[in-house]
Every structure is written in structure tokens, then in C-alpha cells.
Amino acid sequence: MNAAPRDLLRQFLDSFTDIAVIPVRLTPVLSRYYDAIAKDPELSKLALEKCNYVLENLSAHSPEIVTRCSRLYEALTAAKERDAAGNLIVEHINLESVSDMPFLSRDQHMANLIIEEIDVADYIEESPS
């Protein structure tokens, strides 16, 4: 699906909790709409309000509607996390040029690895019979 028109997404958002309008058999393809809504800040806010209402009142809604809202909520939070990750500044540092810390090769790192073998039977208490 290419970018859905905003008015279509709004109409979808208004009716996606109505199984008579969007039947259960269409549930597998709804994730495309969820992703498109997550990209629009205004629609995301409306969707979040609607999903929070449904998820706070689980007993008042069918399991299908709760599942739809859960998946939409996941799409919204994932999009928010992706946006937050875009603000990260990644800096690569070449540790070979640092003078106060010697560069350790892979073998030197492995030399610091301590492996111990323990007998689990020493730590298991026998139950009194």
C-alpha cells in the first residue's frame, strides 16, 4: 500500500474498533494502516487516546478490538522510539591512538576470561524422606 490519504487514515481510525465496519478477516492487513498512522503526529495522538481508552476498559470491549488496539499501540510506541533514536549522536573512536590505555587484541581479552567448572550436586539439597 502506498501512502494512504490522510482522510482515509482518519476514517479508518474512527471505525477500526467497529467489527461491523472492518471485519475480523481483515485484521492481518491492518498493520499497514497502523504504520501509516504512526507517521502522522496528529493521527498518532488521536489513536493513542482511543487505544488508551480501550486498553483501560478491557472488559467493555471484545478480544478482537483489544488485540487491534494493542497492535496499534505497539506501532505507535515503536515509531516514537525510532524517532527518539534518530537524535543520537554516534561517535567512533579509534582506541589504537589512545596513549594511556594499551590496545588489547582479541587474544589478550580472552586471556582475561576465567572459566570455572562447578559440580551442581554440591548446591542441591536432598529433600528429607
From Swiss-Prot:
Domain of life: Eukaryota
Alphabetized UniProt keyword annotations: Nucleus
Localization (cell): Nucleus, Nucleolus
GO cellular component, one term: nucleolus
Record bears the keyword Nucleus: yes
Pfam families cross-referenced by the UniProt entry: Swm2
Entries under InterPro entries matching the protein: Swm2 (IPR031391)
UniProt keyword Nucleus present: yes
Similarity remark: Belongs to the SWM2 family.
The protein's name: Nucleolar protein SWM2
Gene encoding the protein: SWM2
